[in-house]
Curated annotation (Swiss-Prot):
Residues 243-278 are annotated as: Important for dimerization. This is Oxygen-dependent coproporphyrinogen-III oxidase. It comes from Thioalkalivibrio sulfidiphilus (strain HL-EbGR7). GO terms for biological process: protoporphyrinogen IX biosynthetic process. Substrate binds at S95, N111, V112, R113, G261, G262, R263. The record marks H178 as: Important for dimerization. It is an enzyme of class 1 (oxidoreductase). Pfam families: Coprogen_oxidas. Belongs to the aerobic coproporphyrinogen-III oxidase family. Pathway: Porphyrin-containing compound metabolism; protoporphyrin-IX biosynthesis; protoporphyrinogen-IX from coproporphyrinogen-III (O2 route): step 1/1.
Length: 304
């Protein structure tokens, strides 16, 4: 018997997830509030973007839900999958990036998504994707271990091989080839997930989405009151430049969104509000800034 593939329960889950994460982030901030911007897309679908700016803890937090439909796919989607050409599609997901004010609090990103392409007389082509990853400026081993423990816990019900596979994929995906360095300390990344069938794949996507706040909020609570000065802030803004470079050059979601006529404001919501580039800057040996490169920006096993 063929398993039924339905987008409606996925949309229900994702809108609820956006609500829960907004509540968790606003609660951790203590003073900031999310402003909602609902939008529709001429070709079909729409979404709701929620942004918290100038909070006590978070300089900017963007949490976006979208459900877009179209009669055909953009080149970024069909280049490696010619079987998708000529199919109508639906894509839905929640994507978020949290940029904290304090340089001792890492930036975090999470995304869970579902894609389906259909045409008359043919089986639908569908998959799930997503993950979450952490980008510290002044890293702490304790935080990285906690982040990866929660990532592993999200995967464990689905088999012992799942966390190592998606942890490695995350390390490989969030890598700036032109800098030859990782974006951060990783986490989970998965895409094109359909081999488990619809229900199990959907359950895994939910597990990843449901574990994000457990992974991030304890780190925020530990670091948000750490004293810092101009030097730390300057380094944070410099390292944010790497975030911008990755999102505009490599990120699949950004490229897909821009090529498919997505909503530019929502797609670029992931970019930090302030950022700084410096020509050929290098950290002084033996400094906390150098330790980020030497100790944290090297893929490693954080949990057994």
């Amino acid at each position: 018997m063929t398993e039924q593939v339905r987008i409606e329960p996925v949309i229900d889950y994702l809108t609820g997830l956006q609500d829960r994460i907004c509540q968790g982030i606003a609660g951790a901030d203590g003073s900031g509030e999310f402003k909602e911007d609902s939008w529709t897309r001429e070709e079909g679908g729409g979404g709701r973007s929620r942004v918290l700016t100038e909070g006590a803890v978070f300089e900017q937090a963007g949490i976006n839900f979208s459900h877009v439909t179209g009669a055909s796919l953009p080149p970024s989607a069909t280049a490696h999958r010619p079987e998708l050409a000529g199919r109508r599609f639906q894509a839905t997901g929640v994507s978020l990036v949290i940029h904290p004010r304090n340089p001792y609090v890492p930036t975090s990103h999470a995304n869970v998504r579902f894609f389906i392409a259909e045409k008359e007389g043919a089986e639908p082509i569908w998959w799930f994707g997503g993950g979450f990853d952490l980008t510290p400026y002044y890293g702490e081993d304790e935080d990285c271990v906690h982040w990866h423990r929660v990532a592993k816990a999200a995967c464990e019900p689905f088999g012992p091989e799942v966390y190592p596979r998606y942890k490695q994929w995350c390390d490989e995906y969030f890598f700036l080839r032109h800098r030859n360095e990782p974006r951060g300390v990783g986490g989970l990344f998965f895409d094109d997930l359909n081999e488990w069938g619809f229900e199990k794949s959907f359950a895994f996507m939910r597990s990843v989405g449901d574990h994000y706040l457990d992974a991030y909020l304890p780190i925020v609570a530990r670091r948000k009151d750490t004293p810092y000065g101009e030097r730390e802030r300057d380094f944070q803004l410099y390292r944010r430049g790497r975030y911008v470079e990755f999102n505009l050059v490599y990120d699949r979601g950004t490229l897909f969104g821009l090529q498919s006529g997505g909503r530019t404001e929502s797609i670029l919501m992931s970019l930090p509000p302030l950022v700084r580039w410096r020509y050929n800057w290098q950290p002084e040996p033996g400094t906390p800034e150098a330790r980020l490169y030497e100790h944290f920006l090297k893929p490693r096993e954080w949990v057994e």
